[in-house]
Amino acid sequence: MGATHPMMRTAFLLSLLFLLLPLSGCFGSSEDENSPQAPPYYPDINDRQFLDWEWNGSYSMVLEQGPYTPLEVQEATFEVDTSDIWETGPPTSNVHLSYWLPSNTEDGEKVPVIAVISPYFSYGQPGSESGATNVVGAGRGEFIYDNYIPHGYAFAQVSVFGTEESSGCFDYRGAGEGLGIHSAVEWLGQQNWSNGNVGLYGKSYEGATQWEAAALASEHLKTIVPISGTTALHPLLYKNGSAEARSQVMHMNYFGSTVDYNGDDLDNICPDIVEGIFAGPVTYGLGELDPYMENYYEERSHIDKAFQNWNGSIYWIQGMQDWNVDPHQVFGGPSGTNWYLDYSAAGYDVRGMLGQWEHNYPDQWSKHNAQDSGYGGEAIHNMTRWDWGQDLFEWFEYYLKGVGPKPENHAQIQRNDGEWRIEELWPPQDATWESIDLSNCDQQGNSVGGTSVIGGGQQTVTFTCEGFTQDMHIAGLPTLHLDVSASMDGGQIFAELQDAETGLRLGHATMDIRYYAGGYDPQTVFPGQSLVMLMEFQGIDAILPAGHGIKLVLTETGEDYLAPACGNSCPVTVDGGTFSFPQVDRNGDTVFVTPQSSEAANN
């Protein structure tokens, strides 16, 4: 037989190839079945706007549902030695928690834990209490349960001492509470189904418990995600000596909502309960004579202890219009301290999501939509983060499982007009400072506080300053250094910053004159003494259009702050000063668009 023609050989090979092609997926199929799953989808933040999201729920969801299912709830109670923690109180106390495991633990897989540690389980007056730990908490609990258990995470809900079924003293953010929290983190990290890595999540008090845990530095605590979380009690209730109204009753209000008003409550009472009742009024009235700073409040400062003791990662979530847990919990501290910047400079992995929302979660659209003008209202259209569940998923994947790309240590900051951008740090470290000599502005009034001779109303001072020739992007913590004269050892100034053209509120600052040097330490002030009040504004990220100037409205009090304890007898005379603000010039390269849709629930 003669040689095969080249065209015939080619046709034969092509025919063979097409015959074998359908079988190609079968070769090595047993190996593919045992190979690891493809890594989850981690979209770039700039691409998220183009993706399909679950828009119709009350909270955000991950892009891809996980393969596992939650198992039935389990509960645990374990004993903690409290013999050395309280002057009086039980020598041992119990921590109670409930937890849900993903179905892959039935195959022996070890999983990380996401926990919410709270006083809010079975919280409230008898008959109207919130759910117990064995019921998935509304909002934050459902968010974790639905998003992360299917991806192989355990979820735990823990009650602090003296609440729900945890015994012992309700030691409001004190050392006893911290010990119970630390013990819970240790327990969760040591179970035979745990991979040893614990992350904490939650807002407000449930953010405070995260800092309490970090202060005691369990090796199992890998990351915290405080959402408007309290970092220390004194700066929560006081800003440069100005007292919030709740500072007078905070401890007792919590205690009254955690007891059942029966004989079992005796174990919940410890000396700090009584101390807490008096701490607020004494600090408010005595200022520099306050005896509580070195004990009661110092014990309840956690962020400084975590800074010394712990080496985990922090995803900081803060509402820039949150006047419940103010931004200075993140961007403040003792004189010379900015906790966000200091943690970053010390080498911690720190990321921030800083929206113009109030005391809410990034995806809590039902609350976002109710914000007023000057308090985030101008940013509502771009505020809700429907990608929050995915963003946090990528954080947990890396820090609790060690998979996926390392999240960038940046700050996602929203400007007051709604625009989001990426900053390496916030406040930006490349900002330039602009200063305005208030003597060049129009001043109305010369005293703050006291009673006006005309009309009997409170005296106020306003400064209205000329407009700028270009847009001014304020980004950081402006300062107001006021030249004042005191009438006695007391008095207070609340300063609201406004757009002079529109009256739009941009931010505020407050200070008790006894804290004129800034920080936490008061000094005695004498009648007639001239001094400079070194006021610092809460964090602001806002645009002031070209041609617009600033207006400062100085009153005795504002927002939720009390008037000074000295009442009408302590007016402060204002003799001018300097307003300074950090401003940045951005070209738009770091602006990103968040996922939004006309079909979304918030629209």
Predicted regions and their residues:
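Secretory targeting signatures
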Residues: 1-38, 603
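Glycine/threonine-rich phosphate-binding loop and adjacent beta-strand/alpha-helix elements that clamp
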Residues: 38-63, 72-83, 388, 400-603
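Accessory cap/linker subdomain of secreted extracellular hydrolases
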Residues: 39-65, 133-134, 138-145, 150, ...
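N-terminal cap/lid segment of alpha/beta-hydrolase-fold proteins
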Residues: 56-109
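Cap/lid segment of the alpha/beta-hydrolase catalytic domain
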Residues: 109-189, 365-379, 502, 559, ...
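A catalytic-pocket lid/entrance helix-loop region that shapes and gates access to the active site
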Residues: 176, 201-270, 320, 327-334, ...
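Residue in the alpha/beta-hydrolase core beta-strand immediately N-terminal to the catalytic nucleophile
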Residues: 197-199
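Short beta-strand/loop motif that positions the catalytic acidic residue
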Residues: 310, 316-318
